[in-house]
């Protein structure tokens, strides 16, 4: 971690920078007392471990008695940490000021949360191990659109933009997504976003997150969105989510399929596992057809957990075709789930 104390350009501030070479995180702490300007680099894990164990509200003092030592004092505690010259810390010098745009933190968090569970864990297909961010246009309206898929399920969500933006499509890595989500959960306001060919920058007031991007081409996800699913299944969300979760409890492997036996206005869900037993639940639904189809229970729970309204709509075609899932309370998000065999 790199620490810079300044009383000039950024008055009375401590700037902390950390990196793992894939991510760079910069945080400015204001209203600190700078007696003398300075900068150094030390171990982030050791410093974090010390600071988190100091009583809340206690004053902490830093000093640099020599180029190789950083002294940390608080009440009756004194620590001397090994450090190296700040000039050896790897910093990025790219110009991110081009093509900058802003989006509200809650909108950005929505896009991430509604897509991140569909990210692939298959390292051999690195282009699927993140979220694809790009600008789309519907009629004369511009959107920032996010998409993620592991080839068994897919999430797509979009947010309306005030104006068309200059933004090259990017694939944001999984590690970056989860780090960004943790920052957004504690922040409310506009997030400035800018990118160059291989990196992207997010600015949240006093915090900056810079990330490498995934080098690859995201597949044409539009062509796999079902367009002929005319059999509409309408269910109350909470009872559906609870029922799937309960029935799936029978299975030792959560990847076991939950079988849907659909008749007019009735859904029978069942799980049968030779090692642990079986379970069945019935729900009253709106449905005018007959159809048997099976799904991975985890996929259904992941989608249902992200819906905003009180209903879930599942559009079906036949036993072997993917299902299209919509949230009546959010027309800007869709989900596609492949069925399981048997």
Map each language-model feature to its residues.
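Surface-exposed beta-loop interaction hotspot
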Residues: 90-109, 207, 212-236
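Short, structured motif recognition centered on aromatic/hydrophobic residues
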Residues: 14-16, 47, 108, 112, ...
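A cross-kingdom feature marking solvent-exposed beta-strand/loop segments within repeated
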Residues: 23-60, 94, 119-129, 153-194, ...
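A short, hydrophobic, proline-anchored segment that marks a local hinge/packing element in signaling
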Residues: 210-213, 217, 323-342
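N-terminal glycine-rich anion-binding loops that anchor highly charged ligand groups
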Residues: 10-25
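Intrinsically disordered, low-complexity linker/loop segments enriched in Gly/Pro
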Residues: 63, 67-168
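Single conserved hydrophobic/aromatic residue that forms the stacking wall/gate
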Residues: 1-5, 9-10
């Amino acid at each position: 971690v790199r620490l810079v104390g300044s009383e000039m350009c950024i008055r009375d501030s401590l700037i902390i920078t950390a990196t793992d070479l894939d991510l760079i995180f910069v945080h400015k702490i204001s209203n600190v007392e700078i007696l003398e300007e300075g900068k150094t680099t030390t171990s982030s894990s050791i410093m974090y471990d010390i600071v988190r164990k100091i009583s809340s509200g206690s004053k902490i003092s830093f000093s640099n008695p020599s180029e190789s030592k950083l002294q940390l004092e608080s009440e009756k505690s004194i620590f001397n940490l090994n450090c190296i010259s700040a000039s050896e810390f790897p910093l990025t010098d790219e110009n991110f000021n081009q093509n900058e745009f802003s989006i509200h933190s809650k909108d950005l968090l929505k896009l991430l949360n509604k897509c991140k569970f569909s990210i692939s864990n298959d390292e051999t297909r690195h282009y699927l191990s993140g979220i694809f961010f790009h600008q789309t246009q519907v009629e004369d309206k511009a959107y920032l659109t996010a998409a993620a898929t592991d080839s068994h399920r897919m999430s797509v969500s979009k947010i309306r933009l005030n104006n068309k933006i200059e933004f090259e499509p990017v694939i944001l890595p999984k590690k970056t997504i989860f780090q960004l989500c943790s920052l957004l959960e504690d922040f409310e306001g506009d997030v400035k976003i800018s990118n160059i060919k291989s990196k992207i920058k997010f600015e949240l007031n006093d915090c900056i997150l810079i990330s490498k991007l995934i080098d690859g081409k995201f597949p044409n996800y539009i062509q796999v969105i079902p367009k002929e699913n005319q059999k509409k299944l309408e269910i109350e969300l909470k009872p559906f989510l609870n029922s799937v979760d309960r029935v799936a409890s029978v299975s030792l492997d959560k990847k076991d399929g939950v079988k849907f036996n659909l008749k007019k206005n009735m859904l029978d869900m069942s799980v049968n596992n030779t090692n642990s037993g079986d379970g069945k639940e019935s729900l009253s639904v709106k449905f005018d057809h007959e159809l048997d189809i099976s799904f991975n229970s985890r996929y259904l729970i992941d989608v249902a957990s992200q819906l905003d309204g009180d209903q879930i709509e599942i559009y079906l075609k036949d036993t072997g075709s993917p299902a299209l899932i919509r949230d009546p309370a959010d027309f800007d998000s869709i989900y596609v789930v492949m069925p399981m065999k048997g």
